[in-house]
């Protein structure tokens, strides 16, 4: 995969003989007679005469008490600020929002999840631009807050380091039959489906509910948060090794301190986010996501981050990289292990080194350490894959990456499937069409969804949903009902990083834009071929065209508020569902 290009960004920066200004922006609020009022305000928050020469570093955090995913961030921010101080900068902490997908799943609240990514990016940009901060350390721990922070870093193009909250420890459920197993939040969604079909008692559901979240941290499997934290490390925007330690691990405080030091050093070297966020860096991130069999949401988020970085990244890049990179990690939701176990065998650097040694990563990409990815790995000397949590390159779980991009008559602009969970390449079945998720859940609860059905849920796209809701409630219920290998679900919405089963999402164009999914009818035959990367509606072309006559999409659900604005601005999932 390395391109063999001439001078890398790291080489170019090292060759520069200019001395960067470590206060490229904050002079606007600290220097000169006319800034008297601004300095007076800054004195009130702790700055003094000796601090006006220091770079001002924004420490932006999505800390809140609503979800365990972000609870460590308040503590970590203190360590970040200590690192900034010790390196000669002055930290200024500020907050932004975060939405818990685990709490907002399966009801109206999920409409607001993806839009929170844009709100986070916009709010960070607003604070940093208004206050003229010189650099940032951005802390997050949840599915949309991680890409939102990275989008902000890419948009601002300042010295910036990302720091992850860390994941939760697995819980232990002791069930009524005497069995004991490790559980994560995904087990709760699947337990609901099993209970609804009479396959699990309410008592066991209650036991699982009480066990799934034993403390603070993001959901523990290779779901969206851990996937995006791993991607951030592979991009070079986080310190090497920082993605995998769990939230309660005190190594996180050291990573936080070093992140604060690193951003000041980036200013001294003149390194900004877009020096790191190159096309090659995104290919590295895609490679790591593919090797982990990570969340399909990474496709959406990496496209959006690249868009903010002014890097041309397309679905075809995911296909190209995914065809070369094997699926190595036996991690949840399809495997047996969680991020804690990945950390125990060396963390994300183990995967990165294995891919680098195989020629599947660009080792010359610059990172927030000021060194290249290859140099970072040489310092760490990560071990080889252990063979259980992470397979060796010559013994992969699948020979190609865990995510496949689809095209075809049902998805002219593209769709995404987590192929890591497929036992066979082809599924052909009969369409059962539902307008939005609730109708499909009702049918499943009624027992009318059966083997061989293709459940089509439409008007759940970025614009038509709005907000491109995740379908974890329905997919968890399908698996819990014992239909996970026998029913295909396809939607213009999204899936949770914890989704398992036969699921195709991000279908574009979406229904509200008159995409082919809008014209599927009950009883139509649909064919998915993962090996060929195709998703097709097996309907005569003339019949299909006749269905388009007089098409009227469903009216918008929201006509006021943030989602009404979002509906007017958001683009296709095929380009990251960005608001450009």
Swiss-Prot record:
EC annotation from Swiss-Prot or TrEMBL: 4.2.1.9
Sites where the protein binds [2Fe-2S] cluster: 69, 142, 219
GO MF terms held by the record: 2 iron, 2 sulfur cluster binding; dihydroxy-acid dehydratase activity; magnesium ion binding
Associated pathway: Amino-acid biosynthesis; L-isoleucine biosynthesis; L-isoleucine from 2-oxobutanoate: step 3/4; Amino-acid biosynthesis; L-valine biosynthesis; L-valine from pyruvate: step 3/4
GO biological process, one term: L-valine biosynthetic process
Assembly and interaction partners: Homodimer.
Listed name of the protein: Dihydroxy-acid dehydratase
Designated gene of the protein: ilvD
